[in-house]
Amino acid sequence: MSSLLDVPLPRRMHRLPVVRLVHGRAAERAWSWDLRDQWTREWWPQGITWAGERLLVSWYSRRDGGSRISVVDLVARCYAHVPLLTPDGEPLRVHAGGLAWDDGWLYVAATARGFWTLHVDDLAFTAGRAARSTSDERRRDPATWPARRLHRPTLPGSDDPFRWSFMDLAPPGWSSSEERKRRSGVETTTASPRPLLAGEYGRGGKSTRLARLEMSNGQPVGDLHALGEGPAGMQGVTTYADALLVSTSAGPWRRGSLHLAGGPSTELSETDVDQGAPGTLPELAGRAGRPADELASGPFRRAAPIGVEDLTRDDLGRLWTVGEHPGRRAVLRLHG
């Protein structure tokens, strides 16, 4: 049985001072990759999720190199790259814009193709060299990770395939305030299945839908359910109590934004914002919750870093993201 704790971590992370003009107004802590990964234009970080004591970050290659996962220990400030493979052992060529960890299962977004499921037991250690690689760049890769299965759930009643641009796993029994309004009877809070949240990146008239899918033991349970439309340029989604929190990017030189929708738990006071209290976001003061289909209004501008991507929460409920642009890349913990 493999474990992420068994993966050797030969590369070094570095703590960064928080620079809010780069890292966003909600930034609390920041870490940087090593110099090569900070500046490479071949590999671009995208998805993020916590897997117990390890942080996982996905990258895709702009030079047909496939995709990879960085296994990160932020306490020791070290990490390793683990190339992703198809079930046949070929490089997994996906954008990997979102990740979600589900008790040994890893879900990897594959845009129009759906999403892949991987399991930690399938990690294959490579004695320091990645399979099918002879380049110096990947000689320190200690393992490869083959995918098990591709899933492509569709939205009932929609002719347009859902694009799995990003994702995150919600807590057991989570539902949005709008879903609760539509339900009658007693709420169930069973620990399984888990809600998988997902959304579409879109600009220029492309759809920007948000959806949820129940997952159990790495398998979809039931249909994909629509949660409404989000703003253009979405890069990540996670929960905020009974609400949804999404990130949007603004190019390689401007900070991104966060958008909130949901119930009364989204209301904050001026004091919370002024003091920068943990669990708050800049510019949220006085804003009431909104249903998911009104997410496009009321952004909390410049709260997210330049090149903001996927969102996730750790076991303590803290908010995390990653920035993608060379020279400004960082793993970030945000207020929220």
PLM regions: where:
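Beta-strand-rich domains and repeat architectures in extracellular enzymes and scaffolds
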Residues: 1-67, 307
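Surface-exposed loop and turn segments in beta-propeller and other repeat-based domains
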Residues: 11-39, 78-91, 129-166, 222-230, ...
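Structural signature of eukaryotic scaffold interfaces centered on beta-propeller domains
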Residues: 37-52, 94-102, 159-195, 236-240, ...
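Short N-terminal edge-element motif at the start of the domain
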Residues: 44, 51-96
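Loop/turn-rich, solvent-exposed surfaces of beta-rich toroidal or solenoidal domains
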Residues: 50-55, 194-206, 221-291, 301
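Residue-level signature of beta-propeller blades and closely related beta-rich strand-turn architectures
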Residues: 61-62, 105, 112, 121, ...
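Structural motif
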Residues: 63-71, 114-125, 204-215, 252-283, ...
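Blade-level signature of beta-propeller repeat domains, shared across WD40, Kelch, NHL, RCC1
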Residues: 308-336
